Amino acid sequence: MIRPLPPELRGLLARGEVLLTVKDAVRELLENALDAGARRVRVELWGGGLKRLVVEDDGEGIPLEDLPLAVEPYATSKLQDLEGIRTLGFRGQALYALRQAARLRIRSRPRGQLGGGLLLAEGERVEVRPVPAPPGTRVEVEGLFLGEGRDPKGEVRGVLELLKRYLLHHPRLALALFAEGEARLLFPGAGLEEAARLAFGRLLAKRLLPLAYGAGGLEVQGLVSRPEVSRTRPDRLFLAVNGRPVAFPEGLLRRVRRAYRELLPEGHYPVGVLNLFLPQEAFRLRLDARKEEVVLSEEAEALVEEALLALFRRENLARALPEPKPLQPLSPPTASGLPRLRFLAQFRESYLLAEAGDTLYVVDQHAAHERILYEDLLKRVAEGPKPLPRPLLVLLAPEEEALLEAGQEALAALFRWEPFGPGRVRLLMAPAFLHPYPLLLPEVFKEALRGEGRSLKALLARLACLPAVKAGHPLGEAQGQALLDALLTCETPWACPHGRPVLLALKEEDLIRRFGRRSGARGGGEARPRPQEESFPEAPLPREP
């Protein structure tokens, strides 16, 4: 039942403009349809929606006696209190705003009602009468934003973008968009992967991994990109909470970046969609006209990070600090998830060119060697410190001596020592891989003590960088192949310990598309290039260190 909201709720909800564009109007009407349980929605735009806008659904419908209230301000059937928002629309403002801005026509019929109702409204004039009608609701808006010089094509683009976004969060909705009578979007409710092809393009959608994870009444589903796909902005990372599209909270974005830390270059973001299903106590919605901002509980944010890490482990893209174990013999497919790479050539004495199946790989030789050495160091550190052949004296400055009690993570994992007078300690144990370097040991101890590496992994990343083969160093075929074979034994071959990409992959179909050839027609047949929106830029090549 539609009812007016009490004054105290009206004041809290009266923030900002409701309708600024045709896209805003479509959003409000689409959310009403989804709240009504619609499984099919049809949107029609004439003159970009400025002349005429139609949204028709097969949802529950509005009873005849409630139609006049539907176009009154702050009248809604969806909200009892601010703590119980469970629908997409809740302010009771949308139809009233349309009534004030344009001519409004609503035809609706609940499934249990014999006949339907028709409402005609413009300004303060409202007329309601019974009419025959199919189940559901049809809203027609005429003359929206008249005389404002709007661009019809721009309005259509905005609506199309909006509908693709909503399909990522409601992939079982059958949705159609027509502009000037021409079909611009026909989606049969075919699921999330098909919705992703619409939103991201076919090529990018093929590089997304399905995500499904739940714990403690919290659940996340979605699609997220593999390491070879990234953006320098989080503008292709979409979030919804209980079906409501919302902006990514900063806290959650930090969690996502942390999960991808060893897979993506610094400053890069993944691509994809996350659909969160949470109880009311796990989030708080900001009450403004756009309804796009949300505050998530710590448990909800942690769930997403756990889900991503579990996915990466399952796909062999990432692994926590490994237990010591012997390396397994190399056999395709490898533990890394990569096929065995065949060395082709070295380019500019910095990059290795390799192939596997229908894919060409470009490998940064320094980043690859860093990753190999880093994972070897991780395994050796997991064995714990070993007694030094003879104790080693280390001199400490007063500020360094004061840090001994802080118990730095890297310090405790790498060394055992004992006080040996003021400003001195005697090293008793250290990782076996450091034993041959007695001159380096004091510096590593001090760096771990000062926490300059920030963590054990960061310190090991610095140690791996020093001996790694540098850009500009020539490698022969045997050396190049050995480096590639060693890379395939890594748990995370996609990125160096600092987060820069190790390799880029270019599939044969990408070459065919970019050269404008027909797929499979290697004899020289030409074809028109595919539309630009189907392509997606690879991550940029890493700079030389």
Swiss-Prot record:
**What Gene Ontology molecular function terms does this protein carry?**
ATP binding; ATP hydrolysis activity; ATP-dependent DNA damage sensor activity; mismatched DNA binding
UniProt-annotated stretches for the region Disordered? 516-545
Is Acyltransferase one of the keywords?
no
What keywords would UniProt list here?
DNA damage, DNA repair
Could you give a single Gene Ontology term from the biological process aspect? mismatch repair
List membrane-spanning regions.
Answer: none
Record's GO cellular component terms: mismatch repair complex
One Pfam family in the UniProt entry: HATPase_c
Query: So which domain of life are we looking at?
Result: Bacteria
Note the coiled coil stretches, chain numbering: none
Which InterPro entries does this one have? DNA_mismatch_repair_MutL, DNA_mismatch_S5_2-like, HATPase_C_sf, MutL/Mlh/PMS, MutL/Mlh/Pms-like, MutL_C, MutL_C_dimsub, MutL_C_regsub
Q: Does the keyword Transmembrane apply?
A: no
State its role. This protein is involved in the repair of mismatches in DNA. It is required for dam-dependent methyl-directed DNA mismatch repair. May act as a 'molecular matchmaker', a protein that promotes the formation of a stable complex between two or more DNA-binding proteins in an ATP-dependent manner without itself being part of a final effector complex.
Instruction: Give the similarity note.
Output: Belongs to the DNA mismatch repair MutL/HexB family.
Kindly provide the name given to this protein in its UniProt entry: DNA mismatch repair protein MutL
